[in-house]
């Protein structure tokens, strides 16, 4: 079963980030045999990196051998619904993530895969405690 690649790792590779590229590339290379997938939300988040050119995003994902498009399912919606409810409860207590809705949707999507590859594990762990998460 494939691992879902978070947007941050894709950006590291797309912009050849001097700080994060090497570790992000090693992590993706190490999980290539399991398969790699991307959430539709991450594809949307990549738009500014590729000047709004969806074909450029698709070519980039193809070069990385990352499965796209993946379908958003009812199970994804149910997981996102529950996680958003948790997020709002945390917000009312004063502890919130930076980009809550994107992280909720990406984490929910990753629940039906092997896990999530990200360098922002703290953004996901409280909302998705059973989600396997690997960092570079």
Give the location of each predicted region.
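Short active-site oxyanion
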Residues: 1, 32-36, 46, 65-68, ...
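Acidic, PIN/NYN-like endoribonuclease modules and their adjacent C-terminal/linker elements
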Residues: 2, 107-136
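Conserved glycosyltransferase catalytic-site signature
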Residues: 7, 40-43, 100-104, 121
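Nucleotide phosphate-binding site architecture
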Residues: 10-11, 44-47, 125, 134
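Generic detector of contiguous secondary-structure segments
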Residues: 56-76
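Active-site neighborhoods of divalent-metal-dependent phosphate/nucleic-acid chemistry enzymes
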Residues: 69-115
């Amino acid at each position: 079963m494939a691992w879902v690649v978070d947007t941050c790792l894709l950006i590291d590779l797309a912009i050849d980030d001097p700080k994060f590229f090497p570790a992000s590339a090693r992590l993706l290379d190490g999980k290539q045999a399991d398969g790699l997938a991307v959430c539709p939300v991450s594809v949307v988040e990549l738009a500014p990196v590729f000047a709004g050119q969806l074909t450029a995003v698709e070519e980039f994902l193809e070069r990385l051998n990352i499965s796209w498009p993946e379908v958003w399912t009812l199970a994804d919606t149910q997981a996102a619904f529950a996680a958003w409810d948790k997020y709002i409860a945390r917000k009312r207590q004063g502890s919130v993530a930076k980009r809550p809705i994107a992280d909720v949707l990406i984490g929910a999507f990753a629940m039906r895969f092997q896990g999530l590859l990200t360098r922002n594990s703290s953004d996901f762990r409280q909302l998705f405690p059973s989600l396997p998460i690997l960092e570079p």
